[in-house]
Structure formats: C-alpha cells, structure tokens
C-alpha cells in the first residue's frame, strides 16, 4: 500500500479482478462487513484506491493475460517464483499444512509487485536489505 494525501492505496497484480473481490466475498461469507476502503461497488474505476500492475500493463488490451512472473521478466525485475507458484498454494495448504511457505511466497510477490511499480515510475528497485518483513 502507498499513501496519497493521507489515503491508502492498495497495490497488487490483478488486485482489482482477484484479490479485492476474493477478500470481499470471504468477508460476506463470514458475515463480516466490507470496510469502506474496499467497497468499490458504486465507484468509477478511476476513483478506486488501487494500483494494479496487471491493469496498467494491459494499456487497454483485454485479449491477453500477463502473469506477475512474465511481467517481472519483461521489466527486468527478479522473479519471486523460486519455490512455489499460485497453482501450488492449495496443495501446500491442504496437504503440507505449511502456512509459512505460503506466507514467504506471498511476501516475495509483494516485493516483486512493488519493484514493478518502481520500474513503471523509472525508479530504482528495492535492494534486499531495504525490505523489512513484519511478522
């Protein structure tokens, strides 16, 4: 997330079509209220507080899907996919019961997404020592 005029912005790869809808659906299923900062139902797309690298990279092209791994490679950003990828998460969760492995996978995706945003802005990528993981 980044702040803009003291407002939070959520950032992610395909966050508008996967992450945020998934989180909101899970909230409803569990009888929880959707927080105002995630309720985009009556908002215009440009009024949402999201930075979506997937949407940005499309440039209006809706024919193709570009994975985070492919976008990272195209932008010269180191790939986070050195252990598992999204297709393996369910197996790691249900069969291995290894939440720590999934958490590390997600943390790497966050850093990669952040570096892609920095690359879009022609800024220097984060160095490993600049990344702090809060547990």
Sequence positions of predicted segments:
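Metal-dependent phosphoesterase core characteristic of DEDDh/y 3'-5' exonuclease domains
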Residues: 4-103, 116-121, 125-130
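Noncatalytic, basic helical substrate-engagement surface that gates or grips nucleic-acid strands
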Residues: 1
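C-terminal accessory domains and tails appended to enzymatic cores
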Residues: 132-135
